[in-house]
Amino acid sequence: MSWDQVWIDVNVATMSPSVSAPYGAITDAAVAVEKGRIAWIGLRSELPEFDVLSTPVYRGKGAWITPGLIDAHTHLVFAGNRANEFELRLQGASYEEIARSGGGIISTVKACREASEGELFELGRKRLNALAKEGVTTVEIKSGYGLETETELKLLRVARELGKHHHVDVKTTFLGAHAIPPEYKDNAETYVDLVIDEMLPAVIEENLADAADVFCENIAFSVEQTERVLTAAKDAGLDIKLHAEQLSNLGGSAMAARLGAKSVDHIEYLDETGVKALSQSGTCATLLPGAFYFLRETQMPPIELLRKHKVPMVLASDYNPGSSPLCSSLLMLNMGCTLFRLTPEEALAGMTRNAAKALGVEDNVGVLEVGMQADFCLWDITTPAQLSYSYGVGVCLEVVKSGQLVHQ
């Protein structure tokens, strides 16, 4: 037997449903990698004989291996910051009040319109590096801070370039319908026409997006406007997803589920009718505790209903300058448990197996099984629950991406 590398003296949280133990755990395990994929995984005592002289063998010293983490919802490419709005909120202003007065997303739009692709790339690279050091091997990056054709394309080009020049896999999402720009303040329908008739075809022509998203909320786009954009995107061959039920229950999630959305995100105000719609369509529910925490919200997502109806729960950072300037996936694991009362196993599934499903890459990453891409992390922990329990100590020892050691 000949492999490219073998890992021994490790415990593995495979996160695979085919392994009955919590976390899909295999203790005292071994993992073999060949051509960037997992060639063998199981008990070390059952490891087939192999050529130890020609095969690199890594000893984990009892550490834990998990799938590479997947951050399935970020707005990672942007310029500027909104620290001044942070101060305003602490003085009593609400997120909606700031948005309606021309702040919020619109202030970041101005900064992004003025920034060059090179400047945006460097800003994005630093943020991507920060996530990568915590074990993230796949990330989603949205546009949405252009709200005009050229800047939306610019943001997506930068996201694509980050994917080409970084070991982290990048999935891109077109979010032209993120907010109504000031120049269309009294004519939202015309802006929706622009998104559908001009922006979307340009995005498709340059192959800049894997999916499309809309912010469906009272301060943004109605359910009817949202459906128009998502339908056009789906017809153009993109996956679809949605920001929904963050501030109120408009029924956007049920509509998106009917259209076959990969995920609906935020969903603090989602009701049981919406949860049932997600369950029936196989749509994931993406939980964003960073925004919940940073905005000091009090309405929790319907976790018990999601469990009851077996909706896959995803956990993501929502990293952005306004409502979640928290560039840490490990922090989200902790917040998912402490704020939303997920179990540590649910939280880790939300950043591995279920996150892969939300991005449509579940056949390639998210669990550790034979044939899957060899994306995994080695952690200095004694139990997988420790990833959610503790935060701030550098527990990520090594990261393997497609069989290559990329972080030590």
From Swiss-Prot:
Gene encoding the protein: hutI
Protein purpose: Catalyzes the hydrolytic cleavage of the carbon-nitrogen bond in imidazolone-5-propanoate to yield N-formimidoyl-L-glutamate. It is the third step in the universal histidine degradation pathway.
Entry's Gene Ontology molecular function annotations: imidazolonepropionase activity; iron ion binding; zinc ion binding
Record-linked Gene3D superfamilies: Metal-dependent hydrolases, Urease, subunit C, domain 1
Similarity comment text for this entry: Belongs to the metallo-dependent hydrolases superfamily. HutI family.
Residue sites binding 4-imidazolone-5-propanoate per the record: 82, 145, 178, 246, 323
Native organism: Shewanella sediminis (strain HAW-EB3)
PANTHER family in alphabetical order: IMIDAZOLONEPROPIONASE (PTHR42752), IMIDAZOLONEPROPIONASE-RELATED (PTHR42752:SF1)
Cofactor(s) required, per the database record: Zn(2+); Fe(3+)
GO biological process, one term: L-histidine catabolic process to glutamate and formate
Protein name per UniProt: Imidazolonepropionase
Reactions the enzyme catalyzes: 4-imidazolone-5-propanoate + H2O = N-formimidoyl-L-glutamate
Top EC category: hydrolase
Top-rank taxon, per record: Bacteria
Entry's Gene Ontology cellular component terms: cytoplasm
Keywords: Cytoplasm, Histidine metabolism, Hydrolase, Iron, Metal-binding, Zinc
